Swiss-Prot record:
Function recorded in the entry: Part of a sulfur-relay system required for 2-thiolation of 5-methylaminomethyl-2-thiouridine (mnm(5)s(2)U) at tRNA wobble positions. Accepts sulfur from TusA and transfers it in turn to TusE.
Gene designation: tusD
EC top class named in words: transferase
Organism from which the protein derives: Yersinia enterocolitica serotype O:8 / biotype 1B (strain NCTC 13174 / 8081)
Protein's UniProt name: Sulfurtransferase TusD
UniProt cross-references to InterPro entries, sorted A to Z: DsrEFH-like, Sulphur_relay_DsrE/F-like, Sulphur_relay_TusD/DsrE
One Gene Ontology biological process: tRNA wobble position uridine thiolation
Subunit organization: Heterohexamer, formed by a dimer of trimers. The hexameric TusBCD complex contains 2 copies each of TusB, TusC and TusD. The TusBCD complex interacts with TusE.
Any one GO molecular function term: sulfurtransferase activity
Localization per Swiss-Prot or TrEMBL: Cytoplasm
UniProt keyword S-adenosyl-L-methionine, yes or no: no
């Protein structure tokens, strides 16, 4: 069986747990196996994967930019739960202006969205996998 459409939900931060890095490795493996990764929904602490200000040490894997590159190369939609993101200090330019915040820090390639994006992925993908 090949060519399935997948959606992922990532609930772990970019650093500190294995959830996000395992999700990224899974994403790479399923794409390399001929499947289609439609979207990734970052929820709870997973929204920290979209923080543009994350700066890993030189000898560490840059997971934030790796997600961005994966999205660019394979047309993967990177959705970030807007409510969870705002609670954790992550915002795009529009929300920053609406809330009178000093700056935005959402990594390019990621999009703030609601739970509707997760529901849509669950309805349209053959498989949803949570990390």
């Amino acid at each position: 069986m090949s060519g399935l459409k997948y959606g992922l939900m990532v609930t772990g931060p970019a650093y500190g747990t294995q959830q996000a890095s395992s999700a990224y490795q899974f994403a790479q493996a399923l794409i390399n196996s001929g499947h289609h990764l439609v979207s990734v929904f970052f929820y709870r602490e997973g929204v920290l994967n979209a923080n543009q200000l994350t700066t890993p040490a030189n000898d560490e894997f840059d997971l934030v930019r790796a997600w961005q590159q994966l999205a660019n190369e394979h047309a993967v939609i990177l959705n970030v739960c807007v409510a969870a993101a705002l609670r954790r200090g992550i915002t795009d330019q529009h929300e920053a202006e609406q809330l009178n915040l000093a700056a935005a820090n959402l990594q390019p390639g990621f999009t703030l969205s609601g739970l509707g994006a997760l529901a849509e992925a669950a309805l349209t993908c053959d498989r949803m996998v949570q990390f």
